[in-house]
Amino acid sequence: MMMDKQVEEVKKHYPIVEDWSVIVARKEDDCMTVTDAVPFILAGYKNVSYEMDDIVVLCSEPIGLTWEDVRFLKNHEGSVSFEEIGYEDKAMVYHVDLG
């Protein structure tokens, strides 16, 4: 039941918009675990585009992000719609709309 609630929360807060919705999740202490990613995968984010140290990028379609792209998305303000939302007190989740 808890997982169903998490999946619904993901669908509510992070709706997939065509191929362009990207989730960038970072944990404070260690890498994002598989269980952290499961609600996103069940909600439709089936591709882990990039993973390095404490960064995981989930998106609806493989779009070939590189580590530099991830850094750009995390640090860029302006044309990229960028929203930071806490998720379960374990990870900071960034919802990035590339449109």
Swiss-Prot record:
This is Putative gene 45 protein.
